[in-house]
């Protein structure tokens, strides 16, 4: 069994170009849309998920300073964003550590730019926020999650969860 440990390092690519001076990344949270039902035969209310209808997904990128105008321009115009990161894991059967590669590919629309705070002796701490239209997550070369809102795709470990719905359309 592998026991996940921590992120070792990461990098960000926008339109295929590596961006420096990022401090952290917050990947999208996948929340399924719901609708409440109540009435005869139901005691109370049930908040029922709508099958594979993802709510708004947001990507956040925090930066230390805005020294490089090219990086700033890339982040402000970010449409195709790729995040790569490496984690380690302890193999409980061999007591050794393994390195695991991760990638996230996102099609985005920029929606918020935070210029940060100017204070002597401190980082500027800027931020960029994006609406995510398409999200693909890969671990060690295997696609573990793929959501494309505009093309009706919702796959988990390669299994198309929307197939039964799309087959009826």
What are these regions (language model features)?
Residues 8, 55-59, 77-83, 100-102, ...:
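A generic structural signal for short beta-strands and their flanking turns/coil linkers
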Residues 26-54:
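A positional/architectural concept
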Residues 14-16, 63-67, 85-91, 106-112, ...:
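Beta-strand elements of well-folded, non-transmembrane domains
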Residues 47-67, 122-135:
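Oligomerization/assembly interface segments of phage tail-like spikes and tubes
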Residues 70-71, 91-94, 113-120:
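Catalytic micro-motifs at enzyme active sites that drive phosphoryl/nucleotidyl and oxygen chemistry
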Residues 1-35, 164-168:
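Polar/acidic, low-complexity leader/linker segments enriched in S/T/G and N/D
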Residues 109-169:
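Mixed-charge, glycine-accented linear interaction segment located at domain edges/termini
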Residues 73-107:
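Short, acidic/charged, Gly/Pro-enriched secondary-structure junctions
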């Amino acid at each position: 069994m592998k026991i996940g440990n921590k992120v070792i390092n990461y990098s960000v690519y926008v339109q295929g170009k590596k961006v420096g001076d990022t401090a952290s990344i917050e990947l999208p949270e996948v929340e399924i849309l719901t609708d409440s039902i109540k009435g005869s035969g139901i005691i109370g209310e049930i908040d029922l998920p709508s099958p594979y209808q993802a709510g708004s997904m947001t990507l956040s990128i925090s930066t230390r300073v805005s020294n490089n105008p090219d990086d700033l321009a890339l982040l402000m115009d970010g449409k195709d964003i790729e995040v790569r990161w490496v984690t380690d894991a302890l193999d409980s059967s061999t007591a050794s550590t393994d390195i695991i590669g991760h990638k996230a590919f996102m099609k985005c629309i920029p929606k918020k730019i935070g210029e940060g705070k100017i204070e002597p002796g401190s980082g500027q701490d800027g931020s960029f926020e994006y609406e995510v239209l398409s999200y693909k997550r890969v671990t060690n070369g295997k696609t573990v999650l793929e959501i494309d809102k505009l093309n009706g795709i919702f796959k988990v470990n390669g299994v198309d969860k929307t197939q039964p719905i799309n087959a009826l359309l």
